[in-house]
Amino acid sequence: MLADRATLAPAAFSGDVTAADGISRVEWAVNWPADRDDGFINAYCNTIPTPAGGTHEAGMRTALLKGIKAFGDLTGNRKAAQITAEDVMSGACAMLSIFIADPQFQGQTKDKLVSVDASRLVEQAVKDHFDHWLSARPDSAASLLERFIDRAEERIRRR
């Protein structure tokens, strides 16, 4: 995905979790290129591409935002409170795939997942893993926090 580019974290944040029901599953990988702001999220539900995103992407955004804010609080960085999901996801290169029973899509083309449970499933799967990932990589976590704070301050200045 990013083999030829410098990234803020030497190792991508990736993982997979099978839910307690034994059916639902979440797989993800995300990293932030050091040199550019153009990112992407390639998301899938039951191997169906969802180019318009949906509730599963919202769950990932929420988990990453909560995780980086918690890390900011843990390190005593008050500026972390101003970070939004857009600050975290702009420039991120991510892959997200979920497998759920009876997915609900918007429209006939299945471009967007609208299953309410997907957001909660992804957030729960990703959040704890991201917290541990940040704790295990303090240098990468500090670089990410600094980047996100810079983005937040830039966004606030533009108002």
Q: For each predicted feature, which ranges?
A:
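GHKL-family ATPase ATP-binding module
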Residues: M1-R159
